[in-house]
Each structure stands twice: as structure tokens, then as C-alpha cells.
């Protein structure tokens, strides 16, 4: 037996029923005061801590809570505030904090992008002229709160300095170390205050260590953590990595810290190999992330216990920590909120609270022997077996179709240069055609009507009539705005992935399986629990109805396989590429149904393509090849004059531009406005032969852009892209915006387009 310690790395902020989201939005809407917001969120925070305490977690994280984002928290802790927000140098107010994230009338929001290869977004630090100083030791506040209110000796959590700076913008390789030298004493101040307050442990997250980087950068980590160790020798620092294995295992485990946190789930088996090959320092704790913190499936506890027993052979007794692979921020709170799920599926699930229980079971099994938790192990064993052996995961028709993929055509009949002429011939669009990305605002009335329908308070006929009325209203709005290619608005959809999950076999929606995407925006990823199959038309009815209302083309709107995969909780018993191809075959039937019913412009969105890239570049090519294959599997069977669109967002594209072209979509739209033109520079350096729309304004902020701002974005793009290839559109879908600001922004977009179009037509003459 091995003496082990249980630990957690972070807990979901949302609350079991999204109470955190509602509190934030009430504050933003002015219906509660700041004092009330602080009171409501404190209740949620303490409830989360108490649950972890009650479930037997020894090292409970504190300071993982945030009002928006942990990276933004780090920025305001150290006073890294963009000048446009006119910060006075004191402690950052909550209003300024939210302005940085959301923007305000006279200041655009800071850029937002994906947290490594997850669907969580962070606010990008703006590091130009950064002079860090501690304005607010949030970690100390949360540590003292947990101690005072609950008697919890918590483990404060910080985003590590190197990861923080690597995630920022405004510094280059030359200035990086100079900037790092400025941050070290600021971090030391935080750590000294924690040590003085009695903190025993602090968790410093450095997921950058799990990426691919130059080995010379290890010296930066040695410098930082030696400074910390010297400054706070009595504070146990857990240097936490996650999302991948360590390229420089030997160097990392010998850094001057008390504990090293390693992901043993998303490491492709590399970590245990490194441990066997190189051992582990006797004086350090190994925090083994063995419970999957990014997916919702129940752990095979027998396999996890076997792995932990193997790990324990290389770790000094009493120095093995059992924990999730990463923060539980990325999974829903509890499966106890899902009593209506199929019994076999429910049995196979493990949300945040259940993962804490798995950690406790494994810790007890190591410390007291497996027989001490024999009943718990048997229950888990039976549940995992029942799901794997169920008919859900053994659909012979689907498995036969996958086996015969070599017989399925995955290329369009004509090359782009030839088929685009056929598309232009019937579309007859002007220079710089305008469109939107898909969704329009889901007003309180839309959400209430859907909720009433789901509760059975209104009939299917009443609900469908409402959706048609709202669709017709927005078709008229788009025509009045003079948009060229229309959309139906997606009023029937809660989410661009969940909606498809409700219509395809092998998917299961949840009621309260919410996770944070950005700010108060929560998504409810469907569960892909079994083999995926087409069972009914998904989008045809709404698309055909919308097209019947107008002579302008209306886009059919689908979500592509890789985005569905990346924004779902995917079964973990088969490779993701197999699931993506199952989804591709199912969606191919939907694309064909749209085309059969007269929809000749079909958008197949792949916004999450880049975010799913493996952190190790050596693994990129297979992922990208698989992504291209599943996309073409979805789209390749259409006629040559049917125009395929796709959309991507939150992405750096310079390193995957060949993949984007290989998708062979006729038109791609890309989010660009929040990156302030950086993506445009990619197209200044490469030749892209298909049509493209670079988003001309940021939809994530309530701020309405000016005509001049939009024109500046258009003109900048036209320096890189041929005018005849260029489309004009917002960055992303408009579902989360309010109607007045949406219409105002689109009016500005159309006005800006017409003025620039007129300029170009004069030049052509």
C-alpha cells in the first residue's frame, strides 16, 4: 500500500444551474448592485469549496474562481490594463474589469482566444509597455476567505508567469526575458503574502510546458522557480502542467519546486514511459493527473489504479498526489442533475463532482488497499462495461459504412476555378457580396417560447408558428438592410452543436451539462455516447421555409464534423477520427437533402478546426488530414453549381492555410476583428485562390462599430485579397447580441460596403 494525497486543480464556476451566469448578467443589466453580485457569487464559491471538502479532497484549490477569466484576473492583479480603458493606477474596479473583457462605447474589448486546445476562451493580455505591480492579491483574499468561512487550508492557484506572458501579445522574443524579469518580483510579492498568511501549498499553472518549444527556454523556468524557491522556501509550490506530455521531462521534474503536476490522460502514454526511463526525484511530490478533467466519461478505475500503482514505484512514499488531469472548469458540475437520462448512459458518466469521488476512491485504494473500496470499484466496473457492451456502441450498419469508406467520393466533380463560374452565373451577386454568419439575436421572447414548448406549455404547432414568424421577420429585416445572401436566423436552435446532437443517433443532450465558453456564455455540449447515424432531416424545413419568403439566396446552415467533435463530449472508446467520419456520413445525407429541396448555398461551419490542433506540432498532420477528410466527406456530393461556405473563428491561420484551402469550400468566412488585423497579414504573405470573407466587426462586444472602422477593416483586407474574391460579413453569429445593436451594426456594415464598392467600381471604370 502507498500513502497518497487527493487533490483538485480547479472547479466549475457556473454553478449547478448556471447561477453564476445569471448573477453576472443581472449585474451587467443593472438589475443588481455590485454588492449583491459579490454576495451571490460568494455563496456559489463557498458551496463549491464545501463540496470538495465533503468529498474528501485533501488539497482544495482556492482562487480558481473568477468573475470572467483567470488570465484576465492575472492581468488586473498586476495592473496590465490597456491604456484605452484609462485606468488610474489603483485597484481595478469591477466595471473596468468587465470593460476590458466586453468593451465599452469608447474602447474596444481586448482580444479573446482559445485556452490552448479547449473550448474555453481567455482575454489576451496586452503587454506593450507593461510595468507590473501588485494591485490586488486575489489569491490571498480567496485563501483567507476559505480558511475563515469553512476552515479549509486551501491551495491558492495562480497562472504561471511564463504561461501568462506567452499567452499575451505586444512582446517579442527579444523583449520577453526583460518583461519576465519585471514580473518575477511581482509574483514573489504575491507568494510572500501567501506564505505570511500561513499558506502551505500554492499551485502555479504552467501549461506552456506541455507545448512544443525550444529547449533553451527551460532556463527561463529555472530562473523563475529558483527565484520563487529562494523567496518562499517554506511554501510548497506545485508546478502544474496539463493537456499533453512533457518534451523535456528530465529538466522539468528537476526544477526547484516541491511538486510536479503531470497529465497522464492526454499524454498519449508518453508520461509513464518517461517516468520509467528517467525515474522521479525522491524529494518531490508527483501530482498524477489520472482522472480525465476534459471529458465526462466514467473512469475505468481498475486501469487507473493499475497506472497509479505503477507510478508509485517511482515516487517516494507519501509523495504521490492523485488528481484530475486538469482543472474541472471544462466539465459540468454534477450528473445528479440529469435523472432523466438513459440508465446505461447515466451510469457511464462522470461530471466534476463524480470525478472528485473517483479521485477519493483511487486515493483510498492506494492508501488502504483496493479491498477498502471494493464496492465502489465494482459499481464503476459494471457501469463502464454496460455502456461499452450496449447496442449504442455496436451499430453494425454504421460500422459497416465506416469499413467501406474507400468506396465513397470525397472530391467535388469540378475544380474550384471551373465550378465557381457556374455559381456566379446563377447567383449574380455584386462586388463585395454581404452576408451574415448564421444566427440572429435570441430575444427573451424566443428563449421563453422555447422553454414553454420544452415544458409542454405550448403545442408543437404553436411553437413552429412562432419560429416561422420570427424567421419571416428577420428575412424582411435582412432584405430591408439590403444584405445579399440571407440566413434563416437559427431561432429553432439553442446551440450550433447541441441542435444537431438532438437529431442524430448516438448523441444525447443534457439538461444541465453546462460549461463556460467565455464570460457568462455557457454551452451545453452534447454527449456522443455511441455510433452516430442520420435518422431524420435536421435543417431542411426551416431552410426551405426561409427560402420561400425571398428571391435572394438563403444559406442552409450546418455544423461540420470536427467542430461537432471538439464541442461535444466524445466517447473515449474509439479514435476521434472514427467518430468524425460517422458524423460526416450522417451530415452528407443532410447536405444532399438541402440541395434536393432547392437550397443551393450551404454553409458547413468548422469554427473549431484550429482549436483542436494537438499541442505538439508533431501530431498536427494526422489531425489536419482527418479534419479535411471528414469535411469533404460531408460536402463533396453536391452539384457543381451549389456553393459550399464554411466559417472559422478565434484562430491563427498562417500555419494551417494549406489545410483551409484543402477543405475545398467555395467561400470561407473568418473572424478577424478582435485580432486587430493580424490574420489579414497571413493573406498578405500567401496566395489564396478561393473566395473569402474576413469579419469586419466584433460581435462579442455590445459596442456598435462605426462606418469608418468597418471601412478601415475592409480596405486593410483588400490590400491582401483580390476584390473579386472578397465577401463582407460580421465576425461570427449574432445570437448573443441584442436586436437594436445588431441592426445598427449591420446598417453600418452595409453602408460601409456600399461606399467602398462604389469606390472600386469607379476605379474599374
Curated annotation (Swiss-Prot):
Q: What is its EC number?
A: 2.1.1.14
Please tell me where L-methionine binds in this chain.
Answer: 437-439, 490, 605
- Please give the superkingdom of this protein's source: Bacteria
Where's the active site on this chain?
700 (proton donor)
Residues where 5-methyltetrahydropteroyltri-L-glutamate binds: 18-21, 114, 567, 611
Q: In which pathway does it act?
A: Amino-acid biosynthesis; L-methionine biosynthesis via de novo pathway; L-methionine from L-homocysteine (MetE route): step 1/1
Give the record's cofactor note, including how many are bound.
Binds 1 zinc ion per subunit.
Family from the record: Belongs to the vitamin-B12 independent methionine synthase family.
Listed name of the protein: 5-methyltetrahydropteroyltriglutamate--homocysteine methyltransferase
**Species of origin:** Listeria monocytogenes serotype 4b (strain CLIP80459)
Amino acid at each position: 500500500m502507498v500513502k497518497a494525497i487527493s487533490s483538485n486543480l480547479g472547479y466549475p464556476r457556473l454553478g449547478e444551474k448556471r447561477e453564476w451566469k445569471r448573477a453576472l448578467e443581472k449585474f451587467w443589466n443593472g438589475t443588481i448592485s455590485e454588492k449583491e453580485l459579490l454576495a451571490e457569487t460568494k455563496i456559489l464559491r463557498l458551496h463549491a469549496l464545501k463540496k470538495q471538502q465533503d468529498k474528501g479532497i485533501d488539497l482544495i484549490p482556492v482562487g480558481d474562481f473568477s468573475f470572467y477569466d483567470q488570465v484576465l484576473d492575472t492581468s488586473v492583479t498586476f495592473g496590465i490594463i490597456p491604456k484605452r480603458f484609462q485606468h488610474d493606477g489603483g485597484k481595478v474596479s469591477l466595471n473596468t474589469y468587465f470593460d476590458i473583457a466586453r468593451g465599452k462605447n469608447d474602447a474596444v474589448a481586448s482580444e479573446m482566444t482559445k485556452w490552448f486546445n479547449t473550448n474555453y476562451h481567455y482575454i489576451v493580455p496586452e503587454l506593450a509597455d507593461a510595468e507590473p505591480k501588485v494591485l490586488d492579491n486575489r489569491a490571498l483574499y480567496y485563501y483567507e476567505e476559505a480558511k475563515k468561512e469553512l476552515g479549509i487550508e486551501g491551495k491558492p492557484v495562480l497562472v504561471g508567469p511564463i504561461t501568462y506572458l506567452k499567452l499575451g501579445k505586444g512582446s517579442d522574443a527579444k523583449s520577453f526575458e526583460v518583461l519576465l524579469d519585471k514580473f518575477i518580483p511581482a509574483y514573489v510579492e504575491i507568494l510572500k503574502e501567501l506564505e505570511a498568511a500561513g499558506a502551505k501549498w500554492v499551485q502555479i499553472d504552467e501549461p506552456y510546458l506541455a507545448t512544443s518549444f525550444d529547449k533553451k527556454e527551460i532556463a527561463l523556468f529555472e530562473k523563475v522557480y529558483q527565484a520563487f524557491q529562494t523567496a518562499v522556501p517554506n511554501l510548497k509550490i506545485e508546478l502544474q502542467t496539463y493537456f499533453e506530455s512533457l518534451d523535456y521531462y528530465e529538466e522539468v521534474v528537476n526544477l526547484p519546486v516541491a511538486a510536479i503536476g503531470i497529465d497522464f490522460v492526454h499524454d498519449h502514454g508518453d508520461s509513464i514511459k518517461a517516468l520509467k526511463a528517467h525515474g522521479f526525484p525522491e524529494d518531490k511530490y508527483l501530482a498524477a493527473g489520472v482522472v480525465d478533467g476534459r471529458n465526462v466519461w466514467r473512469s475505468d478505475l481498475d486501469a487507473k489504479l493499475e497506472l497509479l500503482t505503477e507510478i508509485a514505484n517511482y515516487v517516494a512514499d507519501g509523495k504521490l498526489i492523485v488528481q484530475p488531469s486538469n482543472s474541472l472548469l471544462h466539465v459540468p458540475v454534477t450528473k445528479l442533475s440529469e435523472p432523466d437520462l438513459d440508465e446505461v448512459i447515466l451510469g457511464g458518466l462522470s461530471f466534476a463532482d463524480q470525478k472528485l469521488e473517483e479521485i477519493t476512491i483511487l486515493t483510498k485504494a492506494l492508501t488502504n488497499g483496493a479491498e477498502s473500496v471494493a464496492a465502489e470499484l465494482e459499481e464503476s466496473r459494471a457501469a463502464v462495461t454496460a455502456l461499452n457492451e450496449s447496442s449504442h456502441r455496436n451499430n453494425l450498419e454504421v460500422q459497416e459504412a465506416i469499413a467501406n469508406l474507400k468506396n465513397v467520393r470525397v472530391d467535388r466533380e469540378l475544380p474550384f476555378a471551373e465550378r465557381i463560374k457556374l455559381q456566379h452565373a446563377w447567383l449574380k451577386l455584386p462586388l463585395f457580396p454581404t452576408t451574415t454568419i448564421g444566427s440572429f439575436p435570441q430575444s427573451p421572447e424566443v428563449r421563453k417560447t422555447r422553454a414553454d414548448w420544452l415544458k409542454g406549455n405550448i403545442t408543437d404547432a404553436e411553437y413552429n408558428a412562432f419560429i416561422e414568424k420570427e424567421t419571416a421577420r428577420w428575412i424582411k429585416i435582412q432584405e430591408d438592410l439590403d444584405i445579399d445572401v440571407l440566413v434563416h436566423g437559427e431561432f429553432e436552435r439553442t446551440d450550433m452543436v447541441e441542435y444537431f446532437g438532438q437529431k442524430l443517433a448516438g448523441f444525447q443532450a443534457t439538461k444541465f451539462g453546462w460549461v463556460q465558453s467565455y464570460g457568462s456564455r455557457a454551452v451545453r455540449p452534447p454527449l456522443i455516447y455511441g455510433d452516430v447515424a442520420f435518422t431524420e432531416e435536421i435543417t431542411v424545413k426551416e431552410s426551405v421555409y426561409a427560402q420561400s419568403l425571398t428571391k435572394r439566396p438563403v444559406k442552409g446552415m450546418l455544423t461540420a464534423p470536427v467542430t461537432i467533435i471538439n464541442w461535444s463530449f466524445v466517447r473515449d472508446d474509439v479514435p476521434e477520427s472514427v467518430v468524425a467520419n460517422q458524423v460526416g456520413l450522417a451530415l452528407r445525407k443532410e447536405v444532399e437533402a438541402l440541395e434536393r429541396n432547392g437550397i443551393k448555398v450551404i454553409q458547413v461551419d468548422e469554427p473549431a478546426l484550429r482549436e483542436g490542433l494537438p499541442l505538439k506540432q508533431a501530431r498536427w498532420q494526422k489531425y489536419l488530414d482527418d479534419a479535411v477528410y471528414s469535411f469533404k466527406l460531408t460536402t463533396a456530393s453536391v452539384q457543381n453549381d451549389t456553393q459550399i461556405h464554411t466559417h472559422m473563428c478565434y484562430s491563427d491561420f498562417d500555419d494551417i492555410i494549406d489545410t483551409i484551402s484543402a477543405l475545398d469550400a467555395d467561400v470561407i468566412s473568418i473572424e478577424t476583428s478582435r485580432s486587430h488585423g493580424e490574420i489579414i497579414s497571413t493573406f498578405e504573405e500567401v496566395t489564396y485562390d478561393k473566395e473569402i470573407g474576413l469579419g469586419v466587426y466584433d460581435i462579442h462586444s455590445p459596442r456598435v462599430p462605426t462606418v469608418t472602422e468597418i471601412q478601415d477593416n475592409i480596405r486593410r483586407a483588400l490590400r491582401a485579397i483580390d476584390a473579386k474574391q472578397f465577401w463582407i460579413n460580421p465576425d461570427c453569429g449574432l445570437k448573443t447580441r441584442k436586436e437594436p445593436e445588431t441592426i445598427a451594426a449591420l446598417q453600418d456594415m452595409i453602408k460601409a460596403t456600399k461606399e467602398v464598392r462604389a469606390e472600386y467600381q469607379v476605379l474599374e471604370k
